[in-house]
Amino acid sequence: MPNQNLIALGFDFGMKRIGVAVGQTVTHSANAIAILKAQDGVPDWEKIKMLIETWHANVLVVGIPYNMDGSEQTLTFAARKFARKLQTRFGLPVSMVDERLTTIEAKRQWYEQGLTKRPQHLDNYAAKLILEQWLQEQKNE
Protein backbone atom coordinates (compact mmCIF):
# COMPACT_ATOMS: atom_id res chain seq x y z
CA MET A 1 0.00 0.00 0.00
CA PRO A 2 2.85 2.45 -0.61
CA ASN A 3 2.32 5.95 -2.00
CA GLN A 4 -1.22 6.20 -0.69
CA ASN A 5 -2.53 8.50 2.00
CA LEU A 6 -4.16 6.00 4.32
CA ILE A 7 -6.08 6.50 7.53
CA ALA A 8 -5.63 3.52 9.80
CA LEU A 9 -7.24 2.31 12.99
CA GLY A 10 -4.97 0.20 15.17
CA PHE A 11 -6.25 -2.33 17.68
CA ASP A 12 -4.66 -3.84 20.77
CA PHE A 13 -6.90 -6.88 21.18
CA GLY A 14 -7.76 -8.29 24.59
CA MET A 15 -10.44 -10.54 26.01
CA LYS A 16 -11.79 -7.75 28.30
CA ARG A 17 -10.61 -4.57 26.58
CA ILE A 18 -9.55 -3.51 23.10
CA GLY A 19 -7.38 -0.43 22.75
CA VAL A 20 -7.87 1.70 19.65
CA ALA A 21 -5.62 4.27 17.99
CA VAL A 22 -5.88 6.29 14.78
CA GLY A 23 -3.06 7.30 12.48
CA GLN A 24 -2.28 8.19 8.91
CA THR A 25 0.48 7.67 6.41
CA VAL A 26 1.04 11.34 5.58
CA THR A 27 2.69 12.17 8.91
CA HIS A 28 3.27 8.57 10.05
CA SER A 29 1.88 9.48 13.45
CA ALA A 30 -0.79 7.90 15.62
CA ASN A 31 -2.94 8.88 18.60
CA ALA A 32 -4.64 6.73 21.21
CA ILE A 33 -8.40 7.32 20.96
CA ALA A 34 -10.43 4.71 22.82
CA ILE A 35 -10.66 1.63 24.98
CA LEU A 36 -13.58 -0.59 24.07
CA LYS A 37 -14.99 -3.19 26.42
CA ALA A 38 -15.09 -6.76 25.20
CA GLN A 39 -16.95 -9.76 26.56
CA ASP A 40 -14.69 -12.82 26.27
CA GLY A 41 -13.00 -11.20 23.28
CA VAL A 42 -16.23 -10.13 21.59
CA PRO A 43 -16.27 -6.36 21.04
CA ASP A 44 -19.15 -4.00 20.52
CA TRP A 45 -19.08 -4.17 16.73
CA GLU A 46 -21.30 -1.10 16.41
CA LYS A 47 -18.72 1.01 18.29
CA ILE A 48 -16.00 -0.24 15.99
CA LYS A 49 -18.18 0.60 12.98
CA MET A 50 -18.74 4.09 14.42
CA LEU A 51 -14.98 4.61 14.86
CA ILE A 52 -14.29 3.45 11.30
CA GLU A 53 -16.92 5.84 9.95
CA THR A 54 -15.95 8.76 12.22
CA TRP A 55 -12.27 8.58 11.28
CA HIS A 56 -12.89 7.52 7.64
CA ALA A 57 -10.47 4.63 8.14
CA ASN A 58 -9.50 2.72 5.03
CA VAL A 59 -7.15 0.18 6.64
CA LEU A 60 -7.20 -1.66 9.98
CA VAL A 61 -4.17 -2.89 11.93
CA VAL A 62 -4.33 -5.55 14.64
CA GLY A 63 -1.54 -6.37 17.07
CA ILE A 64 -0.86 -10.09 17.33
CA PRO A 65 0.67 -11.23 20.64
CA TYR A 66 3.47 -13.78 20.66
CA ASN A 67 5.56 -15.14 23.49
CA MET A 68 9.06 -13.71 23.73
CA ASP A 69 10.49 -16.80 22.00
CA GLY A 70 8.12 -16.21 19.06
CA SER A 71 5.80 -19.06 19.93
CA GLU A 72 2.07 -18.58 19.85
CA GLN A 73 -0.29 -18.38 22.81
CA THR A 74 -4.04 -18.63 23.27
CA LEU A 75 -4.46 -14.88 22.73
CA THR A 76 -2.55 -15.15 19.42
CA PHE A 77 -5.35 -17.22 17.92
CA ALA A 78 -8.07 -14.98 19.38
CA ALA A 79 -6.39 -11.85 17.97
CA ARG A 80 -6.13 -13.45 14.52
CA LYS A 81 -9.80 -14.39 14.69
CA PHE A 82 -10.63 -10.77 15.62
CA ALA A 83 -8.59 -9.56 12.61
CA ARG A 84 -10.45 -11.92 10.27
CA LYS A 85 -13.81 -10.79 11.64
CA LEU A 86 -12.86 -7.13 11.13
CA GLN A 87 -12.02 -7.86 7.50
CA THR A 88 -15.22 -9.84 6.94
CA ARG A 89 -17.54 -7.36 8.66
CA PHE A 90 -16.14 -4.14 7.25
CA GLY A 91 -14.50 -5.20 3.97
CA LEU A 92 -11.36 -3.21 4.70
CA PRO A 93 -7.79 -4.46 4.39
CA VAL A 94 -6.45 -5.71 7.72
CA SER A 95 -2.75 -5.90 8.54
CA MET A 96 -1.39 -7.86 11.47
CA VAL A 97 1.63 -6.66 13.46
CA ASP A 98 3.77 -8.49 16.02
CA GLU A 99 2.94 -6.71 19.25
CA ARG A 100 5.54 -8.19 21.61
CA LEU A 101 6.54 -5.72 24.33
CA THR A 102 3.99 -3.03 23.41
CA THR A 103 2.40 -2.97 26.87
CA ILE A 104 5.82 -2.68 28.53
CA GLU A 105 6.75 0.13 26.13
CA ALA A 106 3.39 1.84 26.75
CA LYS A 107 4.07 1.82 30.51
CA ARG A 108 7.58 3.19 29.95
CA GLN A 109 6.26 6.05 27.81
CA TRP A 110 3.50 6.75 30.35
CA TYR A 111 6.01 7.29 33.15
CA GLU A 112 8.49 9.04 30.83
CA GLN A 113 5.86 11.75 30.31
CA GLY A 114 6.08 12.47 34.03
CA LEU A 115 2.71 10.90 34.75
CA THR A 116 3.16 9.37 38.18
CA LYS A 117 -0.32 8.01 38.79
CA ARG A 118 -0.40 4.35 37.84
CA PRO A 119 -2.42 4.01 34.63
CA GLN A 120 -5.55 1.92 34.99
CA HIS A 121 -5.50 0.70 31.41
CA LEU A 122 -2.83 1.10 28.76
CA ASP A 123 -4.66 -0.66 25.94
CA ASN A 124 -5.11 2.46 23.82
CA TYR A 125 -1.43 3.43 24.28
CA ALA A 126 -0.44 -0.09 23.23
CA ALA A 127 -2.70 0.30 20.17
CA LYS A 128 -0.88 3.55 19.37
CA LEU A 129 2.48 1.75 19.48
CA ILE A 130 1.17 -1.08 17.31
CA LEU A 131 -0.08 1.44 14.76
CA GLU A 132 3.16 3.46 14.86
CA GLN A 133 5.09 0.26 14.12
CA TRP A 134 2.86 -0.42 11.10
CA LEU A 135 3.16 3.20 9.93
CA GLN A 136 6.96 2.95 10.13
CA GLU A 137 6.84 -0.20 8.01
CA GLN A 138 4.75 1.66 5.40
CA LYS A 139 7.25 4.51 5.40
CA ASN A 140 10.11 2.09 4.74
CA GLU A 141 8.39 0.42 1.76
Curated annotation (Swiss-Prot):
For this UniProt record, the keywords arranged alphabetically read as follows: Cytoplasm, Hydrolase, Nuclease, Ribosome biogenesis
On the tree of life, the source organism's domain of life is Bacteria
What is one GO biological process annotated to this record? rRNA 5'-end processing
| CDD domains tied to this protein | YqgF
The principal localisation class reads cytoplasm
| Gene3D superfamilies (alphabetical) | YqgF/RNase H-like domain (3.30.420.140)
Look up the record and report any one GO term of the cellular component aspect. cytosol
What pairs make up the disulfide bonds?
none
PANTHER family recorded for this chain?
POLYNUCLEOTIDYL TRANSFERASE, RIBONUCLEASE H-LIKE SUPERFAMILY PROTEIN
As for family, the record states: Belongs to the YqgF nuclease family.
Question: Which protein are we looking at?
Answer: Putative pre-16S rRNA nuclease
Identify the taxonomic lineage of the organism of origin.
Answer: Bacteria, Pseudomonadati, Pseudomonadota, Gammaproteobacteria, Legionellales
